[in-house]
Amino acid sequence: MRSFVLRARAAPTTSKALLEGVGNEAHTEILAHTMMNTMFVAQSHREDVVVHFVLESTKDFSRTITIRSNDITNIGGFHESTLIAAVARALDASVGMGKEQLREVEPGITVRTVSFERLVQELAEDHQLYMLDKKGEFVRDAEIGGNPCFLLTDHIPMPKKSYNSLKRLGTEKISLGPKMLFASQCVVLIHNELDIREF
């Protein structure tokens, strides 16, 4: 199983603001692009992939939207507007939820009111965590564990205080090269590296 977490610090937790954020300061289109590149390949979708989007621009609780490739049925296509609409439906389903609650949105998609920190604590129990960092070990040289989870951010960097928490969870830093890439580009390179290794 390959898992990805995108910490979308600028992404709002209401569907209206999310949709308005496409192409604007929040850059919510990154969610659609990352979903497309984690889940889909030409004429098919990948098996055994999970992506978690943690949307943090909120007045109450962060929203963690989880999409499981093995369980999604008909998401309606894989162009940007369709994919961002799936995220918006999850946000609509989360209205009125209390802290640390979960709701199923549709097959393969759930929404939870949990923070990034809480999510990665849970994932660390049965995944090896990898954080992308230009100063990390080059991915071609890195040993990737059997149940990897890759941590990414939107255009707002990971807060420095998060690094110590992630380190305590055994997170390893890996690098995809000298250039700072979009999260949606990173997932393509990670998938390709693991595909080449016949993971």
Curated annotation (Swiss-Prot):
Cited InterPro entries: Alpha/beta_knot_MTases, TrmY, tRNA_m1G_MTases_N
Localization per record: Cytoplasm
Principal cellular location given in the protein's record: cytoplasm
GO cellular component: cytoplasm
Keyword hit for Ligase: no
An example molecular function term from Gene Ontology annotations: S-adenosylmethionine-dependent methyltransferase activity
Broad class of enzyme this protein falls into: transferase
Pfam family, one: Methyltrn_RNA_2
Disulfide bonds: none
Listed transmembrane segments: none
Methyltransferase in keyword set: yes
One of the protein's GO biological processes: tRNA methylation
Protein name in UniProt: Putative pseudouridine methyltransferase
Annotated source species: Vibrio campbellii (strain ATCC BAA-1116)
Highest classification ranks of the organism: Bacteria, Pseudomonadati, Pseudomonadota, Gammaproteobacteria, Vibrionales
